[in-house]
Every structure is written in C-alpha cells, then in structure tokens.
Amino acid sequence: MASSSTRKYETRKRDPNSKIAALLVIDMQNHFSSMAKPILNNVLTTIDICRRASVPVFFTRHNHKSPTDHGMLGEWCNGDVILDGTTDSEIIQEIQGQVTGPDEMVEKNTYSAFNKTRLQENLEKIGVKEVIVIGVMTNLCCETTAREAFIKGFRVFFSTDATATFNEELHEATLMNLAFGFAYLVDCDKLRRSLLGN
C-alpha cells in the first residue's frame, strides 16, 4: 500500500524500470543523523530492493575541503559547513557497509549531486535513464538533485518514505512541488512491487 504522502501528492503514475534505473542515496551522514535515523530502515530497505533488482546504487557525501569551496553555502550556513575529515562528514555507520566500491561514492560540496561531479557521466556510461532519489535533506540536496536530474533528461522517482528533513511541512512542500513538475512519487512498497514483483 502506498504511503499517505504518495497517495496525497502524486499527480502521475509510473513504475521505475530496473534495466535503466539507478538509486541515488543522498548525504546519509553523521551531520544529518537526527533526520537520517528515523528513515534509516526505509533507506536500507530501498537499497536492498534495488540491489536485489540489479539496480546500481550511488551514494553522495557532502563535504568541504577548504574555505575556497564553500560558495554560497558558507554564507547561507554562517560558515557552519561540513568539513572533510570530520566525524560529521562520515557516512553513518549503518550505511557504510552498503558502499561496495569507490565508483559508488559521489563527493559534492553543494546541494546538487550533479554539480562539478562525474555523476551524470557515470550514469550515462552504464545506460541509466531513470534515477530514484532517497536520503536527506528532502527539500535541499534531495530536491535539488531530483530537479537537476529532470533538467538533464533523466526520469525521476522520488521517495516519500526514505527522505527526510527538519519538519513535515518542508518535506511535504517538496513532495507537492516535485510531483507537480519533476518526479514520480514512490515509497518502499511501490518499489518492492515494481522492481521485484512482490
């Protein structure tokens, strides 16, 4: 059964195709653990479903290596950015074991997983035409990545129950906006049915 948010906001229905899809797990890091922990089981479930369906999985890690790469985030966050090499920058322990190779990790220093990374190139190289977005924060890095994926020509599926942010109001605003113009909404149950047939 679809989650209430999926039913409430979805405007179009479509299932992802495991042959051309990839999963993007956004910023499941210690810095965001208060938001990430409540959705951890759904994130792990989604990763498991995708692995069982032979859907490639990519993880992002947000971090800053020097003051020169802070960009507007430095101003917006009053300099409180995630610094590389700190505990805050590390992927949370429960997710670390899911990362199976260096090609799966995308290092980024802004909201988008596509900006100044090789993500698009790596997706296109393996024939990916659809992306499934999960992780944190719903309304910042997840939403920006989803919107940019759409603009770049990828079909986007956005999880309602494996994404999270500061509060439900911001979370639902993103779901409403993405469903209106950028993404098909999915949840763990819908992904299980569409990718595994059960």
Swiss-Prot record:
Pathway: Cofactor biosynthesis; nicotinate biosynthesis; nicotinate from nicotinamide: step 1/1. Keywords: Hydrolase, Pyridine nucleotide biosynthesis. It comes from the Eukaryota. Its EC number is 3.5.1.19. Transmembrane segments: none annotated. The keyword Hydrolase applies. GO terms for molecular function: nicotinamidase activity. This is Nicotinamidase 3. It comes from Arabidopsis thaliana. The gene is NIC3.
